């Protein structure tokens, strides 16, 4: 069974330490994945102000965020401008590409996207994407062919802005099948490959799921009859939970699960009927995420 492995790289620390760790692990298992990089300023520490929201505070406590992410991530860009990841760590990003992994754009400024994208019009969104697109193109020596928005924060304006780039596909939402997004009654050409499985921070500490049984729980969610797309984070599975993720990958292999870049799924799975992207709340995540409108059977 082939399953898409999407690796989101949100921060300077995740790029510097998590990406090389994950590349080494995947090479040892003869697997490749899709890495989506944030390449602009690392201002993730500015999310600390969200601690004033009870749901976000509970999530931070439930996942033991300080030990999970590290204080350098939690404070980065809070009191001073964060480093531009793509300029400081271009060799790390390029090394993932040279190792045969698919490399796509996550964001220019990950924090700014999550915090302000809803207030941006299409041109402002295009400008944000263009900054990241241009820097990543320079690093890779060619334009990136795919993208994935931070935090599954997407909108019709985002989809229209992305349609102005030569992306083969985007992965901007949660769902259950590959589809063409509908905007203002029209089907866009760029397909969406949605994430079908929950992330570590959405399930650990809930419903009896702990680090001790997390791998078994996640493996139980894979369905050979359906599209399977898993998102991990370089900051989590690539650093704090690296050993646990290595055990997960080896257990998945023993069950016949082979992780592949998302682009492979375009060839393996037919695109279903077109669908709109809508905002929904899902268990374990604070606030809304973008979801495939007809995805009634999502695993959360």
Language model regions located:
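Catalytic alpha-helical scaffold of carbohydrate-active enzymes acting on polysaccharides/glycoconjugates
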Residues: 1-146, 151-191, 209-230, 237-300
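Positively charged, amphipathic and often flexible ligand-engagement surfaces
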Residues: 192-206
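Active-site clefts of carbohydrate-active enzymes
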Residues: 200, 232-235
